[in-house]
From Swiss-Prot:
InterPro entries, per database record: NAD(P)H_OxRDtase_bac/plastid (IPR023043), NADH_UbQ/plastoQ_OxRdtase_su3 (IPR000440), NDAH_ubi_oxred_su3_sf (IPR038430)
Name used for this protein in its record: NADH-quinone oxidoreductase subunit A
Superkingdom classification of source: Bacteria
Organism whose genome encodes this protein: Syntrophotalea carbinolica (strain DSM 2380 / NBRC 103641 / GraBd1)
Oligomeric and partner information: NDH-1 is composed of 14 different subunits. Subunits NuoA, H, J, K, L, M, N constitute the membrane sector of the complex.
Entry's Gene Ontology molecular function annotations: NADH dehydrogenase (ubiquinone) activity; NADH:ubiquinone reductase (non-electrogenic) activity; quinone binding
Subcellular location, record wording: Cell inner membrane
Chief location category: membrane
Signal sequence residues: none
Entry EC number(s): 7.1.1.-
Length: 141
């Protein structure tokens, strides 16, 4: 019976592509056409555009004023530390909030896991505090 079913199937252009196959073919043609347009516009701008290379063209534009210093001033380290601490504790809040939503489903195992997580972060915070990572003032010598 299986051999009869296989032998009676017709193979035509519609049988090669399922409806999803036609959608993917249309998407592939769209992406290819978009890439061709982008590349052709970039090449046209490259070959047809006006080029003038002067030292003045290489300077950054600051509202018509000549640049006076470096483009990227350095920021004090405490700002970076604050950003890193924010990310660490923001992730901690996300874990604790997700635990709080499902605490009744997690049982004692979930409580033990979140307690271990909080204790680990508290130990890390105490370590950073002892090392002086949280001190913003002048360094003691």
């Amino acid at each position: 019976m299986v051999s009869e079913h296989i032998s009676t199937q017709q193979v035509g252009p519609d049988a090669l592509f399922s409806p999803l196959g036609w959608d993917l073919l249309a998407l592939a043609l769209y992406v290819a056409l978009a890439c061709i347009i982008v590349v052709s516009l970039l090449l046209a701008a490259r070959f047809l555009g006006h080029r003038s290379r002067t030292p003045l063209k290489n300077l950054p534009y600051e509202c018509g004023v000549e640049p006076t210093g470096p483009a990227r001033p350095g920021y004090p380290v405490p700002f970076y530390l604050t950003a890193i601490f924010f990310v660490v504790f923001d992730v901690e809040v996300a874990f604790i909030a997700s635990w709080a939503v499902a605490y009744d489903l997690l049982g004692w195992a979930g409580l033990a896991q979140i307690a271990f997580f909080i204790i680990t972060l508290l130990v890390a915070l105490i370590y950073l505090w002892r090392r002086g990572a949280l001190d913003w003032g002048p360094q003691r010598r």
